[in-house]
Amino acid sequence: MNIISVGVNHKTAPIEIRERIALSEVQNKELVTDLVSSGLASEAMVVSTCNRTELYVVPGMPEVNCDYLKDYIISYKNARNAVRPEHFFSRFYCGTARHLFEVSCAIDSLVLGEGQILGQVKNAYRIAAEVGTAGILLTRLCHTAFSVAKKVKTRTKLMEGAVSVSYAAVELAQKIFSNLSMKKVLLIGAGETGELAAKHMYAKNARNIVITNRTQSKAEALAEELGTNRVLPYESYKEHLHEFDIIITAVSTKEYILNAAEMQQSMAKRRLKPVIILDLGLPRNVDPEVGALQNMFLKDIDALKHIIDKNLERRRAELPKVKAIIDEELVAFGQWLNTLKVRPTIVDLQSKFLEIKEKELERYRYKVSEEELRRMEHLTDRILKKILHHPIKMLKAPVDTADNIPSKVNLVRNIFDLEEPNQSLQ
């Protein structure tokens, strides 16, 4: 029994290729169902995100190998004119397991340690389970991957520290003010960057968020999504600057929208109570001289990127610990995988000795009392258990490579004169 995987990701193919191969949830279900119903695979699962489309398969026919699956996906997506086999990676046996473990704990991600990929892998398994294409092997593989990700999260610091500008801004605000639930926040700009910052703020328990934007309807839509319903007209927000403890700017402009004179007036009204200004604009939205004012903490994108770089450096330092966890789980998974290969021989061995026992006991069934027969049966069961203990232990013992398994199996089958294994048990 083997498991193979092929796919495209940010390491193997540019974005235009990844877009051509990407699968919707409907296509995901259709692809894995077709593979299994046709007998090409006994199990199948697809992990499809914005950065990767990866197919995991337990082959059902000898001709189903990595090259076959690459061609299958290209054909399914009608992408032969743009996508080539060279755009794909290939993995098999424990290499497939290692890859999924690395994907699940986010060391194979574009952003090291990002938190979304585990949920995406879980969704891939959910889809396969729903349509019935996740069998014993994929189920064990996925649950081991989930366990790896959990251990990485609890035993390492791989996922600690902000690695996006908007999240770094919020993390910095929390370090300065500690309890954001008590602070009043003004968001200037409701575009993508501002929206992310507002959502991160909300996730950190900031509930008093006021939004202003050139297009008021956009500010109102974001406010409604956050559940604040608090919006200031863009023309008049400067009249209220003194009311806010945290100001986030994220607008597209060539001119500073806040200058030192305006903020000095605001600070006077606040009686010098501290203010954090997080300038997420590019070009900058806030005059750098604002940062020189008393109790005014101004951080722009460059300052935040310095924080991000430090956090990424700390995450990279955790990689040896992460890889040690993966190696540990990979050994256990490989040993379990090997037991599947020897299971038919173990079943046949036990069946043969059980048959011998039954035949021999049958010869004495009418020659002894029921009590004596019961004792004989109990005795032979104990003898058989001891006789079979070492052969079964040897079959289950870890091996250096999967190539060593057939030699062990053949040795046992020849010694005990077992018939060809039942393929349905493999």
From Swiss-Prot:
Membrane-spanning ranges: none
Chain residues that bind substrate: 49-52, 109, 114-116, 120
Pfam families: GlutR_dimer, GlutR_N, Shikimate_DH
One GO term (biological process): chlorophyll biosynthetic process
Superkingdom of origin organism: Bacteria
Xref: PROSITE patterns: GLUTR
Entry's EC annotation: 1.2.1.70
Sample GO molecular function, one term: glutamyl-tRNA reductase activity
Catalyzed reaction equations: (S)-4-amino-5-oxopentanoate + tRNA(Glu) + NADP(+) = L-glutamyl-tRNA(Glu) + NADPH + H(+)
Record-annotated active site: 50 (nucleophile)
Keywords of the record: Chlorophyll biosynthesis, NADP, Oxidoreductase, Porphyrin biosynthesis
Family: Belongs to the glutamyl-tRNA reductase family.
Domain notes: Possesses an unusual extended V-shaped dimeric structure with each monomer consisting of three distinct domains arranged along a curved 'spinal' alpha-helix. The N-terminal catalytic domain specifically recognizes the glutamate moiety of the substrate. The second domain is the NADPH-binding domain, and the third C-terminal domain is responsible for dimerization.
Additional remark text: During catalysis, the active site Cys acts as a nucleophile attacking the alpha-carbonyl group of tRNA-bound glutamate with the formation of a thioester intermediate between enzyme and glutamate, and the concomitant release of tRNA(Glu). The thioester intermediate is finally reduced by direct hydride transfer from NADPH, to form the product GSA.
Self-association state and partner proteins as the record states: Homodimer.
Function: Catalyzes the NADPH-dependent reduction of glutamyl-tRNA(Glu) to glutamate 1-semialdehyde (GSA).
Name of this chain's protein: Glutamyl-tRNA reductase
Taxonomic lineage of the native organism: Bacteria, Pseudomonadati, Chlorobiota, Chlorobiia, Chlorobiales
